[in-house]
């Protein structure tokens, strides 16, 4: 049986934190599905297509280098439902701090109640990427700040183009 993991998020934009999670997650599964959430009530900076392109450009090579299958997709329903539809046995969630942990534990409990066969696997962020949040990256980029320490080069270029 193939071990399929779903790594959900908005990826608006992809950060070095996301990259860190993927570097760890590819060793836990045979196939990693990075699922870009489409929330109709939110106005992301990057379109769904742009976010999918970033995911492919930045994250897919990490999976390939580790010999892990890779897929990027979108979803607009409950994350656990998307995982179930994808045939995933686990959902990958990155943890930066205690606030993330408290929220994610509550979510994991509810998800396990709804779909008992899917486990939530927590991946602790490496020290260097713990402070990185996509929201802060967007704010820094919008004000002309240098985000090169927080995102891959291709994403930094996309942010620069978006705000110029």
From Swiss-Prot:
According to the UniProt record, what class of enzyme is this?
A: transferase
Pfam families registered for this protein in UniProt: CTP_transf_like
- Protein residues bound to substrate: 10, 42, 79, 93
Kindly state which reaction or reactions the protein catalyses. (R)-4'-phosphopantetheine + ATP + H(+) = 3'-dephospho-CoA + diphosphate
Q: Where is this site: Transition state stabilizer?
A: 18
Q: Which InterPro entries match?
A: Cyt_trans-like, PPAT, Rossmann-like_a/b/a_fold
Which keywords annotate this record?
ATP-binding, Coenzyme A biosynthesis, Cytoplasm, Magnesium, Nucleotide-binding, Nucleotidyltransferase, Transferase
Q: Name one GO biological process term.
A: coenzyme A biosynthetic process
What positions belong to coiled-coil segments? none
Pathway given for this chain reads: Cofactor biosynthesis; coenzyme A biosynthesis; CoA from (R)-pantothenate: step 4/5
Q: Name one GO cellular component term.
A: cytoplasm
Q: Superkingdom of this entry's organism?
A: Bacteria
Q: What cofactor requirement does the entry state?
A: Mg(2+)
Family listed: Belongs to the bacterial CoaD family.
User: So what does this one do?
Assistant: Reversibly transfers an adenylyl group from ATP to 4'-phosphopantetheine, yielding dephospho-CoA (dPCoA) and pyrophosphate.
Q: Supply the PANTHER family for this chain.
A: PHOSPHOPANTETHEINE ADENYLYLTRANSFERASE (PTHR21342:SF1)
* Name listed for the protein in its UniProt record: Phosphopantetheine adenylyltransferase
This protein's species is: Bradyrhizobium sp. (strain BTAi1 / ATCC BAA-1182)
**Gene for this chain:** coaD
């Amino acid at each position: 049986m193939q071990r399929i993991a779903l790594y959900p998020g908005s990826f608006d934009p992809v950060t070095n934190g996301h990259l860190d999670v993927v570097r760890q997650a590819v060793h836990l599964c045979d196939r990693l599905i990075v699922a870009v959430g489409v929330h109709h009530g939110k106005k992301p900076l990057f379109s769904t297509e742009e976010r999918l392109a970033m995911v492919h450009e930045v994250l897919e090579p990490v999976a390939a280098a580790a010999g892990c299958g890779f897929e990027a997709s979108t979803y607009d329903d409950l994350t656990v439902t998307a995982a179930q539809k994808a045939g995933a046995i686990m959902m990958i969630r990155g943890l930066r701090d205690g606030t993330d942990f408290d929220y994610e534990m509550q979510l994991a409990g509810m998800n396990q109640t709804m779909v008992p066969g899917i486990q939530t696997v927590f991946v602790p962020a490496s020290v260097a990427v713990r402070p990185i949040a996509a929201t802060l990256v967007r704010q820094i980029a919008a004000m002309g700040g240098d985000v090169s320490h927080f995102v891959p080069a291709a994403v930094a270029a996309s942010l620069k183009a978006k705000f110029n």
